[in-house]
Amino acid sequence: MNRLLKTIIENNRKWISEGKVASYIPELSKMDKNLLGISVCTLGGEEYWEGDAEVKFTIQSISKIVTLMLAIIDNGEDYVFSKVGMEPTETAFNSIVNLEAKESHKPINPMINAGAIVVASMVAGKDSDEKFDRILKFTRKISGNNDIDINLNVYESEKETGHRNRALAYFMKSTGALKGNVEEILDVYFKQCSIEITCKDLARIGVMLANDGVSPYTGDRIVPRHVARIVKTIMVTCGMYDASGNFAVHIGIPAKSGVGGGIIACAPRRMGIGVLGTALDEKGNSIAGTKILEELSKQLDLSIF
């Protein structure tokens, strides 16, 4: 497996030149464009990795699957999906278009920024600190890594420049789609996006999802089966922003990307995968990371379709 991963990384390193690091968050623009790594965890608990698999980077939008799991556990799926939809979108992840066009003003799915902000508001906690503390502890639990923490520099950078997210949140507040203190909810959202992880952490979360919520390392149930299945389904339909259909056709496994360059993926009942490629395409997905997953999926016949 390690030889295969090494070959796949080298085969797809050429794609880095076609992407750019995220620049709209100043702290992310400092990232090394050439980072490329992969980690794979099997249902048997075996771990393989190559490249920059142990380099820390911020989770960004991959945190949306973490908070979605937690919000469903806290509130039940019926309540969560009464506040946020579950349909794919053809618009960008930070678009306001559907919020204005739809009569309910409900965000179209939990993987776009507007939807994730509403989901963050549904995580239980008496204030923003308690909500984020629960998100951080849950991230540590599902990854099996108690050392995971927030990158405060990225958090401050996001908070200072998150004007589009503020616009989305205040628009939803004006229509009644978002309840609570907007600045406190945004603080939770900016913090969750600034959690620092590695490819190895993502692969361990991925294999837990691949195993329907059970840790292959301990045999313990970490997430209810129905929650794991809901999240995997949303990952397939919405996880790669407005490139989710293309990803499903060419790779065919549940995945979620983040503008920090990470992608988490899982092949149900087979493996979890974490990829890092900091150079992004115009949709905000890792360009080399996507190509790596495409080759891995073809080599191992991972597609669920």
UniProtKB/Swiss-Prot annotation:
<dbReference type="InterPro" id="IPR012338">
    <property type="entry name" value="Beta-lactam/transpept-like"/>
</dbReference>
<comment type="similarity">
    <text>Belongs to the glutaminase family.</text>
</comment>
<feature type="binding site">
    <location>
        <position position="189"/>
    </location>
    <ligand>
        <name>substrate</name>
    </ligand>
</feature>
<dbReference type="InterPro" id="IPR015868">
    <property type="entry name" value="Glutaminase"/>
</dbReference>
<feature type="binding site">
    <location>
        <position position="259"/>
    </location>
    <ligand>
        <name>substrate</name>
    </ligand>
</feature>
<feature type="binding site">
    <location>
        <position position="241"/>
    </location>
    <ligand>
        <name>substrate</name>
    </ligand>
</feature>
<feature type="binding site">
    <location>
        <position position="165"/>
    </location>
    <ligand>
        <name>substrate</name>
    </ligand>
</feature>
<feature type="binding site">
    <location>
        <position position="158"/>
    </location>
    <ligand>
        <name>substrate</name>
    </ligand>
</feature>
<feature type="binding site">
    <location>
        <position position="113"/>
    </location>
    <ligand>
        <name>substrate</name>
    </ligand>
</feature>
<protein>
    <recommendedName>
        <fullName>Glutaminase</fullName>
        <ecNumber>3.5.1.2</ecNumber>
    </recommendedName>
</protein>
<dbReference type="GO" id="GO:0006537">
    <property type="term" value="P:glutamate biosynthetic process"/>
</dbReference>
<dbReference type="GO" id="GO:0004359">
    <property type="term" value="F:glutaminase activity"/>
</dbReference>
<comment type="subunit">
    <text>Homotetramer.</text>
</comment>
<dbReference type="GO" id="GO:0006543">
    <property type="term" value="P:glutamine catabolic process"/>
</dbReference>
<dbReference type="Pfam" id="PF04960">
    <property type="entry name" value="Glutaminase"/>
</dbReference>
<feature type="binding site">
    <location>
        <position position="61"/>
    </location>
    <ligand>
        <name>substrate</name>
    </ligand>
</feature>
<keyword id="KW-0378">Hydrolase</keyword>
